[in-house]
Amino acid sequence: VLSITSAQAGWDPNKSETAANQNIQDYEVQQAITDFRNNDPSMKVFFEKAYGFAIFPTVAKGGLGIGGAYGEGKVYSKDVLNGTSSLMQFTFGLQLGGQAYREIIFFKDKTAFDLFKYGNFEFGAQVSAVAATAGVSANTDYSNGVAIFTIAKSGLMFEASVGGQKFSFEPLN
């Protein structure tokens, strides 16, 4: 008779992996925030005055006729971590390539923030993000309580496509 038992050694590899992934994502989130601040110093006002923000350190996007994007991020109100979020996007139209970018969504007030937290938040095709480059945020305002900025990380993508972004929110326990 063959018997397999598990010995408890005080180590749960699943918990360690989760903790390691958490540390990696925390570093990536901090690096993304630093990148947004450094690319456009005038973005400081959004960080100071916004009720909250959702930041996605890496959104991977690709397409060949039909495309998609996915990213995971963190959601803050007044610099306090409230939870995590995922971003999904499906597009159709003329598109070819792949790219990675960072995305940040600022929420002007509690109403906009709560809409994000308590529903399946979605941006339609008519809402667009602004590329965060020096000085651009000085001329950018909120639309429907949100302001969205992106920074390219890598890749090249040609597209004339239509699609929206859908978000989910998972509060901290």
Q: Model regions: which residues?
A:
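Sec/Tat signal peptide C-region and signal peptidase I cleavage site
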Residues: I4-A9
